[in-house]
Each structure stands twice: as structure tokens, then as C-alpha cells.
From Swiss-Prot:
Gene Ontology biological-process annotations: translation
Record's protein name: Large ribosomal subunit protein uL29
Domain of life per record: Bacteria
Single GO molecular function: structural constituent of ribosome
PANTHER family, per database record: 60S RIBOSOMAL PROTEIN L35/50S RIBOSOMAL PROTEIN L29, LARGE RIBOSOMAL SUBUNIT PROTEIN UL29C
Pfam families: Ribosomal_L29 (PF00831)
Organism: Synechococcus sp. (strain CC9902)
Length: 69
């Protein structure tokens, strides 16, 4: 799963960003559950999901700050 460019993330609508954030939070929860039950084989998925989530949250907060100004 390739990491999206920041420019690609910035082109998404607010609803799409919120949807992707919710999906990634669910994915991270599922990954933690799999790790706790020793079913997780690909531990690099944690890093990928956290980086994608950080990108989305950064763009979301940038938009919130720009509308507040």
C-alpha cells in the first residue's frame, strides 16, 4: 500500500479526509488487536498507517486554521 503524496491528500474533500481518518483509526485498532493476540505478521503496517493518519490530520488541521483566520 503506497503512501499518498501530501498534494494528493490536499486535493481530497473534507468528507473524504474524515472518512479516511476514521478508517485508519479502525485499522490501527485492528492491528493492535492482532498484535496482542499474536496474529500480526506484517508489523510494518503500523508505521504505514500512523504516517498516513498523521498526513491526513495535518491537512485537516491546516484547513481548520485557515478557515478560523
Amino acid at each position: 500500500m503506497a503512501r499518498p503524496n501530501t498534494s494528493e491528500v490536499r486535493n481530497l474533500s473534507d468528507a473524504d479526509i474524515n472518512e479516511k481518518i476514521d478508517g485508519l483509526r479502525r485499522e490501527l485498532f485492528q492491528l493492535r488487536f492482532e498484535q496482542a493476540t499474536r496474529q500480526l505478521a506484517n508489523t510494518h503496517r503500523f508505521k504505514e498507517a500512523r504516517i498516513k493518519l498523521a498526513q491526513l490530520l495535518t491537512v485537516q488541521s491546516e484547513r481548520q486554521r485557515s478557515t478560523a483566520s
